[in-house]
Amino acid sequence: MQNKLKLIAIVPKISLLKNRLDQVLASLFKKHSRTILKRHILSKDVCVNGRILDQPDAKVLYKDIISINLKFKAKNDYQAENIFLNVIYEDDDILVINKQDNFVVHPGAGNTSGTLLNALLHRDSTFFNIPRAGIVHRLDKDTTGLMVIAKNNLSYMALIDQIKCKKVIREYQAIVYGKVISGGTIVKSIIRNPIKRTTMIVNKCGKRAITHYRILKRFTHHTHLKIILETGRTHQIRTHMLYINFPLVGDKTYGNKFKFYKNISLTLLEQVKKFPRQALHASRLCLYHPVTKHLMEWNSTLPRDMLNLIALLNKNI
């Protein structure tokens, strides 16, 4: 079963540096690849001022109104499942949750059920009619914290656009191995590891990624950080922190080879080793409401496991 989503945009002057239809579409709808957009043109899914244009090299003008009828697969292949969601805000257009750990966001290889998507489909059947069931960004399975979900197609496209334009503030708290001397910014491209495809690595051939980090508190052998994402690449924080030799506590994928300090107490060593997940929490989310345009902000306190870890580290300063 296929559903439809209509995208509409007005051609600005800046897009007319190259006024071919396919080039203008690529500049207006950057989330979609040139190949996909060209396919929509040839399939007669694109209208300019209400008239179908099916030639990629057709010329468009300033203030022309372009619309695309996108088709996407409905989520009927996925099962609605009654899974608890910690909802901290909801209206007709958006849903904000505080995601728990050990919770996959979207079905994939090895995770076809028990995900956030399955939970959303159970909560409201209208999510079947929204791309990705309204999920506009992700958190890793064992990362906790704030996520926003779109409840209709208008909100979905508006939130995607805000993320693309870097208008959404996503702030995290993390506990890392090592004593970080000062805050900083990491600007390093990230690419999928060609040897181990489930992981990411820093590589100049990858996608540009920017991570800002600030010190909240230093401990003897660890540091509590505030981290702000400017981009949102897969495993970005975990990959970047490993790159600068301050991997996340509990990260079995990106921190398991980190050497513990020799003078650390045995009690602390055992507790840190037993921490069950990467110590990472999405603590602050700030965005413009997709309909009212009001600036909205949500904050989430650290989960119990991270609070307990900080308390333990405080005792060993």
Swiss-Prot record:
PROSITE patterns: PSI_RLU, S4. It catalyses: uridine(1911/1915/1917) in 23S rRNA = pseudouridine(1911/1915/1917) in 23S rRNA. Keywords: Cytoplasm, Isomerase, RNA-binding, rRNA processing. GO terms for molecular function: 23S rRNA pseudouridine(1911/1915/1917) synthase activity; RNA binding. Its main location: cytoplasm. One of its GO terms (biological process) is enzyme-directed rRNA pseudouridine synthesis. It comes from the Bacteria. Residues 19-83 form the S4 RNA-binding domain. GO terms for cellular component: cytoplasm. It is found in: Cytoplasm. It is an enzyme of class 5 (isomerase). SMART domains: S4. The active site is at D140. Its EC number is 5.4.99.23. Pfam families: PseudoU_synth_2. Belongs to the pseudouridine synthase RluA family. PANTHER family: MITOCHONDRIAL RNA PSEUDOURIDINE SYNTHASE, RIBOSOMAL LARGE SUBUNIT PSEUDOURIDINE SYNTHASE D. Responsible for synthesis of pseudouridine from uracil at positions 1911, 1915 and 1917 in 23S ribosomal RNA. This is Ribosomal large subunit pseudouridine synthase D. It comes from Buchnera aphidicola subsp. Baizongia pistaciae (strain Bp).
